[in-house]
Amino acid sequence: MALPTLPSYWCSQQRLNQQLARQREQEARLRQQWEQNSRYFRMSDICSSKQAEWSSKTSYQRSMHAYQREKMKEEKRRSLEARREKLRQLMQEEQDLLARELEELRLSMNLQERRIREQHGKLKSAKEEQRKLIAEQLLYEHWKKNNPKLREMELDLHQKHVVNSWEMQKEEKKQQEATAEQENKRYENEYERARREALERMKAEEERRQLEDKLQAEALLQQMEELKLKEVEATKLKKEQENLLKQRWELERLEEERKQMEAFRQKAELGRFLRHQYNAQLSRRTQQIQEELEADRRILQALLEKEDESQRLHLARREQVMADVAWMKQAIEEQLQLERAREAELQMLLREEAKEMWEKREAEWARERSARDRLMSEVLTGRQQQIQEKIEQNRRAQEESLKHREQLIRNLEEVRELARREKEESEKLKSARKQELEAQVAERRLQAWEADQQEEEEEEEARRVEQLSDALLQQEAETMAEQGYRPKPYGHPKIAWN
């Protein structure tokens, strides 16, 4: 049996399909491997980032904060439980205490009720006893009032009492008059003593105030003298400041003159170089140097004169400055003599020698001028510094003087204000003491007048009572004499009193 023959294109198609399938499988495996690798790296990145985050300081702080929060919550919870337990115990203790108080109150109410009942019984019995005593007393008073013998005895006793009381009233009146007189004398003596003490106090206060016024006046005079001295000192300081400013301006003017002379010398020197006239130039240059030296000498002489006029420099610095200026003056005079000798010598030189001598002397002159300018600059700078220091010292002294004067003026104003207040207080005190004394005198007079009025009223009342008693007694005696004895009817049997 023969097998069917497969065409060739079918085999190639099958191989192509197999190759495509293998390629797809490989791509699927690669894609799967890529996804696994990417997932692995992604997970690794996530793990590393989480580990880095967890191991970082921020994560540590966050963890510690969370731990602290949990710990604080736990502590708050325990504290809350403890407070609740304590509150529960307090409420239980309070309930127990209230129960005990209620029990004690119930017992005390029973005891109080028993005591009230006992007190009620005692009060009732005491009231019955008191009622009996009052009834007996009333019966006794009724019998005493209606008994004629007792009434006669009472009338006799009353007459004797009136007579005796009249004598006693006379004695009491005399004693009261004597006592009132003694009181008046005592009041007068006390008033006189108080008046003398007040006068002595006022006199002592016046003497003390006069002494204080005298001391204050002396202090004011002293402060005013000091203020005048300070004003004179301020005027002196202002004048001194003006002089210092003038000296500084003079120094500036001298320095400006030196600068102008230097500029003029430079211009003249330039002209001489252009004309090449060495002999004439040497003569003129020598004359110019002499003029410069003369000018420097005049400046130093002026500085010496200013230093002699100065009164506020320290001694050591002043001597140093004087020595420097004197040395500079001596050096300039020596230089001036040397220049004069050179001028005489230059008259004998030839043209070529004069040229060489010109160059040589010009170098020497330049060195000497530089040294001289430096020394003059130092001297002028020192003088300017001294003047500036004087100006500063003068300014500070003026400020101190102004402050002191202002303080003195304030002190004077305070002293005047204090004196005014003390005077007002003294006047008020005098007025108050005067009013107090007048009030005491008026009060004592009023007391004496009230005592006299009361005594007169008492005497008048005593006389009126006595007259009324005598009239009633006489009227009662006449009535009894006219009517005779009449027994009184009694509505109840008499009680035999022992």
From Swiss-Prot:
UniProt cross-references to InterPro entries, sorted A to Z: CFAP53/TCHP, TPH_dom
Coiled coil location: 11-39, 66-136, 163-353, 380-479
Compositional bias of kind Basic and acidic residues: 168-189
Tissue expression summary: Expressed at high levels in normal urothelial and breast epithelial cells. Also expressed in the smooth muscle and endothelial cells. Reduced expression seen in advanced bladder and breast carcinomas (at protein level). Ubiquitous. Expressed at highest levels in the heart, skeletal muscle, kidney, liver and testis.
Record note on what altering S44P does: In a gastric carcinoma sample
Presence of the UniProt keyword Membrane in the record: yes
Record note on modification: Ubiquitinated. Ubiquitination by the BCR(KCTD17) E3 ubiquitin ligase complex results in proteasomal degradation, and induces ciliogenesis.
Annotated region described as Interaction with keratin proteins, given as residue ranges: 73-498
Cross-link (Glycyl lysine isopeptide (Lys-Gly) (interchain with G-Cter in ubiquitin)): K50, K57
Similarity remark: Belongs to the TCHP family.
Subunit-level organization: Interacts specifically with keratin proteins including, KRT5, KRT6A, KRT8, KRT14, KRT16 and KRT18. Interacts with KCTD17.
Protein's name according to its UniProt entry: Trichoplein keratin filament-binding protein
Upper classification of the organism: Eukaryota, Metazoa, Chordata, Craniata, Vertebrata
